[in-house]
């Protein structure tokens, strides 16, 4: 039992402060709240404990009533001869009943049944008393002393206040603020800095009264609370339906407490408290039961809330009284250690930094100096760090000395350290930056680093992979909680994080590890947008705004951007299918009639070899583009062609398409192909006798659509006209981009365009050797053709038509092809043997309960199951 928490007093200082209210001395539960044994700021060591530092250890204290020595003695009853300690409210109540009937004259203990004498609890006490008072045993003084003791016992049993008697229930020393301020050379914070009344409000509440209060763990709920303790101007409340472990304290002028009926008048509804021990459906009946014949607190005893200060007027170093958040029944001597905006850092005098906290300057948990004395509330004096080394305080105080290392001065900044998140910056492959907060604040650098890791993990899209990366960092091992899970990470040791520079280095390492933008987390709030991410975003917007847009176009742009960093020899990309453009525009060209350089011939020969080797699994279109060079320069002026659609036929004249192979154009051609779901036997047969490129094209039977746009410069409509595709050169190189593909096969009749005068013609495909003789440049651009099917569609095409017949591997294949993030659950499906039949029966509750899936993946899989059921129903129709 901590002596400072007991507030033991001598006979000369046993009286309460002037004006002590009746409520402060009315019940045992109030004493219980004010005499808790847990260590806290302001709890001091009693003189008795300091005297027992040598020799034989002190005898373990036991409950005065039941003799229990294992339970903490949380309840103290001051008496004439000292104090009585108890383990529970029941023990202290029973002791008071027995004490009112009579007490031992020698030891002041209760006289139980079977005692040898009505005045003594035991023979030993009787013998001691006889030896001590043998000469005056029959004198009148003994009788008068006995009469005084009986009157005091009756006064104690009645519970009435005794301002000057030794049996006052709550007695405490009045802290001398003037002497303390003079000793420390500091000043007290003025009353205008606090959101507190000038004079502490009267507390007319009584234990057992019921009222409405906001649940401190869920401030949106209004619950029924019972007053279980009264101390000065404060109330100890317990939510009905909750246990005693969640009691909380409120001032009588708080806006969080109201009279019964206030919630209903304002259109609200009383809610069960968080952690309601009964069934939620029984709440209405339970509410009627507890309010029936209850002692309801009258509305007039609730005090109005005081006005709040207009701004933060605190100064560093000012003294005040503050509630200990870890032991809220205590108000202790404290100091303003730091100020930042609306926040102040409260430190408790004489204690290490474990109990310090940040709060708003409008907080109701801070009071001006002298508030406790005026409100008759016990005030805990400053602690003494030197006493923590004594053996008795080590046993009584739960604050270990090694905690000082975690809160060393090197780790505590002058003001709270703050890290700012910039959601506009890229979060990389592991972080969803939309889930990041704007900022986090920590009292120490290490705490801030831990908070940053916690927020990054909470916003992660793949916590399993990211936690491995964070654990690979250097530093001390810590456990952080994010998204309902515990993760083991590493944070630099306190000795390495001494200033902002070290913290900034850690944040930079964190961003690099997460593959995010270096400006995603910073110690300085930057209003300007990150230039790197802004430029990247502008490029994406420009690319997405360029019509027409398609996945093929994006793939081409990615390849073009990658080609800037590759050597010229790497720019020739392997292709599975080479398509020669059958479009030729009339242009004025000046060509070199000399022989083609050997490098160009080698490149063309390499291209033809690649075309022949990759024709079996063709998914890409490679179009040879010839820039304006020394050997071939073009200055074409053409009119924009609306659309040229052509189909592959068996009677394609490949020789006619190769006659104009030396003519070049600088037009921009948008090539789009679509995969034809139905196959044509005659077309594939007729194409079998052609070259490798021709046979490959015939295999897909996809109509190729060319949309030609001239360059913006030198556009002369009079010099442009359409040519029949049969007369267009197949070797004419056109810089290409891809338009939106067609979704189905088109017949020969549907490809004719009457409005623009564009006729549908046969697709001309040059032989493999034609490319070698054409005067073309060796630069090639590879773009993805829409002929290639998406991964999910290609994977699903191999599945059986009926999902009910799917095997386990087919189910896993279907899920992985539709959502790559669900691929990690493949082994789980194998473990539970989820085949097609089981897949159709899955629901989110079943997957979460029996398969251990989280809600997010379970909902994704349910969505895929619904798609399968929809397709199944369509097939049945």
UniProtKB/Swiss-Prot annotation:
MBT repeats: 175-273, 281-382
Any Pfam family: MBT
Domain remarks in the Swiss-Prot or TrEMBL record: The SAM domain is essential for function.
Domain SAM: 806-876
SUPFAM superfamilies: SAM/Pointed domain, Tudor/PWWP/MBT
Modification Phosphothreonine occurs at: 546
Outcome when changing residue 834 to T: Complete loss of function. Significant loss of self-binding activity. Moderate loss of ph-p binding activity
Sequence positions bearing Phosphoserine: 549-550, 585
Gene: Scm
Residue stretches of biased makeup (Polar residues): 560-569
GO MF, one annotated term: sequence-specific DNA binding
Cellular component GO terms, alphabetical: nucleus; polytene chromosome
Residues annotated for Zn(2+) binding in this entry: 63, 66, 87, 91
Effect in UniProt of substituting residue 854 to A: Partial loss of self- and ph-p binding activity
Protein name in UniProt: Polycomb protein Scm
Family according to the record: Belongs to the SCM family.
Alphabetical list of PANTHER family matching this protein: POLYCOMB GROUP PROTEIN, POLYCOMB PROTEIN SCM
Origin species: Drosophila melanogaster
Start-end of Low complexity biased regions: 7-50, 598-620, 724-735
């Amino acid at each position: 039992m901590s002596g400072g928490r007991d507030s033991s007093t001598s006979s000369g200082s046993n009286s309460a402060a002037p004006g002590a209210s009746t409520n402060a001395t009315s019940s045992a539960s109030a004493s219980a709240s004010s005499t808790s044994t847990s260590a806290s700021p302001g709890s001091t060591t009693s003189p008795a404990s300091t005297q027992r530092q040598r020799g034989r250890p002190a005898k373990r204290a036991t409950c005065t009533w039941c003799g229990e020595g294992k339970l903490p003695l949380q309840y103290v009853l001051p008496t004439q001869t000292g104090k009585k300690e108890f383990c529970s409210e029941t023990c202290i109540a029973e002791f008071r009943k027995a004490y009112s009937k009579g007490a031992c004259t020698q030891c002041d203990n209760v006289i139980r049944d079977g005692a040898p004498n009505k005045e003594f609890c035991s023979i030993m006490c009787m013998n001691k008393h006889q030896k001590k008072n043998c000469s005056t045993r029959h004198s009148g003084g003994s009788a008068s002393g006995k009469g005084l003791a009986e009157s005091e016992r009756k006064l104690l049993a009645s519970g009435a206040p005794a301002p000057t008697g030794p049996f006052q229930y709550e007695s405490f020393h009045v802290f001398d603020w003037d002497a303390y301020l003079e000793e420390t050379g500091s000043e007290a914070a003025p009353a205008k800095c606090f959101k507190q009344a000038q004079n502490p409000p009267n507390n007319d509440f009584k234990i057992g009264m019921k009222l409405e209060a906001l649940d401190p763990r869920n401030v949106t709920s209004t619950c029924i609370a019972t007053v279980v303790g009264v101390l000065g101007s404060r109330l100890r409340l317990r939510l009905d339906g909750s246990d005693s472990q969640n009691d909380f304290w409120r001032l009588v002028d708080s806006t969080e407490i109201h009279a019964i009926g206030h919630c209903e008048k304002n259109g609200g509804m009383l809610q069960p408290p968080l952690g309601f021990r009964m069934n939620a459906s029984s709440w209405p009946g339970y509410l009627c039961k507890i309010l029936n014949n209850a002692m309801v607190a009258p509305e007039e005893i609730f005090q109005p809330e005081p006005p709040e200060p207009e701004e933060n007027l605190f100064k560093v170093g000012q003294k005040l009284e503050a509630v200990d958040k870890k032991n809220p029944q205590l108000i202790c001597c404290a100091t303003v250690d730091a100020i930042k905006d609306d926040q102040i850092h409260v430190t408790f005098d004489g204690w290490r930094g474990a109990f310090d906290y940040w709060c708003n300057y409008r907080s109701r948990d801070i009071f001006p100096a002298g508030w406790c004395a005026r409100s008759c509330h016990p005030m805990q004096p400053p602690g003494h760090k030197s006493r923590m080394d004594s053996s008795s305080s080590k046993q009584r105080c739960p604050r270990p000395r090694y905690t000082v290392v975690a809160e060393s001065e090197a780790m505590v900044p002058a003001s709270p350290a703050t890290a700012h998140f910039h959601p506009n910056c890229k979060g990389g492959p592991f972080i969803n930056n939309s889930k990041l907060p704007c900022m986090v604040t920590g009292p120490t650098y290490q705490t801030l680093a831990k908070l940053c890791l916690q927020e990054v993990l909470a916003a992660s899209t793949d916590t399993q992979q990211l936690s491995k990366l964070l654990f690979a960092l250097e530093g001390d091992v810590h456990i952080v909680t994010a998204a309902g899970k515990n993760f083991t990470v590493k944070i630099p040791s306190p000795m390495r994080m001494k200033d902002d520079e070290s913290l900034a280095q850690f944040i930079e390492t964190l961003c690099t590890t997460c593959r995010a933008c270096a400006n995603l987390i910073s110690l300085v709030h930057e209003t300007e947008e990150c230039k790197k991410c802004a430029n990247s975003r502008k490029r994406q917007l420009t690319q997405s705004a360029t019509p027409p847009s398609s996945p093929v176009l994006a793939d081409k742009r990615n390849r073009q951007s990658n080609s800037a960093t590759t050597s010229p020899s790497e720019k020739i990309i392997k292709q599975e299918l080479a398509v020669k453009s059958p479009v030729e525009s009339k242009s004025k060209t000046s060509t070199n009639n000399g022989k083609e350089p050997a490098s160009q011939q080698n490149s063309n020969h390499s291209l033809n070899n690649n075309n022949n080797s990759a024709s079996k699994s063709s998914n890409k279109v490679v179009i040879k583009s010839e820039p304006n060079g020394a050997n071939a320069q073009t200055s074409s002026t053409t009119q924009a062609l609306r659309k040229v659609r052509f189909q592959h036929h068996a009677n394609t004249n490949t020789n006619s398409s190769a006659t104009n192979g030396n003519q070049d154009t600088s037009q921009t051609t948008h090539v789009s192909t679509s995969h034809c779901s139905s196959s044509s036997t005659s077309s594939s047969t007729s194409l079998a006798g052609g070259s490798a490129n021709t046979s490959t094209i015939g295999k897909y039977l996809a109509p190729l659509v060319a949309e030609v746009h001239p360059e913006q410069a030198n556009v002369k409509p009079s010099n442009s006209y359409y040519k029949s595709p049969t007369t267009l050169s197949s070797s004419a190189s056109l810089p290409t981009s891809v338009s939106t593909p067609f979704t189905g096969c088109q017949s020969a009749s549907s490809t004719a365009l009457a409005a623009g005068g564009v006729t549908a013609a046969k697709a001309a495909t040059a032989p493999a050797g034609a490319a070698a003789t054409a005067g073309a440049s060796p630069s090639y651009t590879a773009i993805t053709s829409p002929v290639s099917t998406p991964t999910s569609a290609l994977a699903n095409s191999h599945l059986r038509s009926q999902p009910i017949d799917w095997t386990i591997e087919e189910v896993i294949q279907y899920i992985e092809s539709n959502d790559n993030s669900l691929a990690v659950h493949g082994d789980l499906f194998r473990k539970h043997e989820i085949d097609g039949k089981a897949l159709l029966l899955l629901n989110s509750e079943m997957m979460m309960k029996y398969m251990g899936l989280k809600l997010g993946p379970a909902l994704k899989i349910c969505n895929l199951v619904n798609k399968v059921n929809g397709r199944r129903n369509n097939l049945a129709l």
